[in-house]
Amino acid sequence: MVISCGATDKAMMARCIELSRVAARKGEYPFGTVIALNGQIVAEAINSTIRDGDVTRHAEIIALSRAQKTAGRERLRRYTLYSNIEPCAMCAYCIREAWVSRVVYALGSPVMGGLSKWNILRDDGLSHRIPEIFGAVPEVVSGILLQEAQQAWRDWSPLAWEMIKLRGLLTAPCAQAGHIHVQPEHSRSLRHYLHVLFLRSGQLRSRIGRPLEHLSDL
């Protein structure tokens, strides 16, 4: 994995983080994506899974669709996709099928990530065995504006962010699997917790000092 950055990458990632904050204000989870060509934004998007009631409406998927329409073609060679969070497996397959040349993200996703967990972004077998469908392995740049990306999630819900960190769901991209703190399964899913935490954010502000065991009382 390549870990480097320039002024353009930082500017584009700053926009992704800004979009993630917009998503949070609109009642979505804080994900934002930008697609650029030669340093110019071609498309951008936020998650709309809650608004649309559609689990496939990830920011990366929406941005890819918009970029393809703007470009007038399916394949996005020489384009860069930026996201505040490492794309999931679903989004990673779409990135490969769209032939995106470069992927840049801030926070890694070791449990669900299309690179760190499932290796889709680095799997050259896709393009070797099905070259008619999948593009070459993209360059991957990670860790851009890491602290700023973390702060956006922390601002969205401090208590949810603490739980996410404890479960090792979003981490610095270089973290090794052995360093991820795996939490035992709970009776209710992470999706349920995040949804409840978001809906009750006003109540949570007064509970931040309480132990995490009190999540079961929500």
Give residue spans per PLM region.
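Zinc-dependent deaminase
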Residues: 1-23, 93-218
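Small-residue (primarily alanine) positions within well-ordered alpha-helices
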Residues: 16, 20-23, 33, 43, ...
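Short, flexible loop/turn motifs enriched in small residues
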Residues: 26-30
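Short beta-strand scaffold segments in enzyme catalytic cores
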Residues: 31-39
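Short beta->alpha transition motifs characteristic of CBS
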Residues: 42-49
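Residues that line or immediately flank small-molecule/substrate-binding pockets and catalytic motifs
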Residues: 49, 83, 107
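A short, polar/charged loop-to-alpha-helix boundary motif
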Residues: 51-61
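Helix-adjacent hinge/juxtasegments
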Residues: 65-102
